[in-house]
Amino acid sequence: MRAILRFAILALACFLVAVGGGCEQAATPEPKLGDFANPQRVTILGYNDHAMEPFVSRDGKYLFFNNSNEAVDTNLHWAERIDDLTFQYKGEIGGVNTAALEGVASMDRNGVFYFVSTRSYDETSSTIYRGSFDNGTITGIELAPGVSTATPGIVNFDAEISPDGNTLYFVESQFGSSGPQNANILIATWNGSAFVRDSNSATIMKQVNTSKNLEYAPAISSSGLELFFTRLVESSPVLYVATRTDASSPFGAPRKITAATGFVEGPTLSPGEKSLYYHKREGSLFVIYRVTRP
């Protein structure tokens, strides 16, 4: 089951590029004044392994991340903020990790914690879970109701919850015998007891999702007007942002986050939304970086 997680999807997509069936370059607007700049590496004191899929809690106190997606046992970890570029490692998050894969953390302002796990995919064809985070431990873990279609071969391998907890931005991928056929970002809203898929997702995401690229790792601003995500372009993942004028309108044409160079994925905003964190491959190690805007 680990073969259908993000690292495998990207590895296969890169292979397809090499044999001539790869991803299509999408046109993007030029950078604008006020875009993100000044990439800087983040330090996690007391931790020297891979750090991927960063998420900064809405109050700015904690950094959640997972170790390498290619690890035999990928687990969720947490660290406490010292400053914008320095966090103190606290260990694995309690109550959540299993022998399966756990990763891709996000959390709303009320401490409802979301993550991806393969623990029950063979039985449920579902991967997005939620629980309550408190002082380094997650309790009350359950499948996020209403998100999955529970269809074998369809995989939700990324998600981020909005700050208010009312909207889930998630990724859905259809798998065939040769691997992923697509990966698109969809939307679901919370109705008080379950999520309901937004019937307008295709319209809202029309300029974000593409037919030949993979779009994944969504991150939404508190206003709902900025959507950050990763797109696999040719053989490399690239960070993008798409904007809109109101929270019910479609997103416009995405722009590259040009300051985030190299093999980069998994953007996430700081609480003040002046910093964008992401992971980057440096040599054989994945580390966390930050870019900033005025």
Question: Where do the protein language model's features map onto the residues?
Answer:
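Bacterial N-terminal signal peptides
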Residues: 8-18
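Short, conserved micro-motifs composed of acidic
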Residues: 27-294
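Bacterial N-terminal signal peptides that target proteins for export
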Residues: 1-9
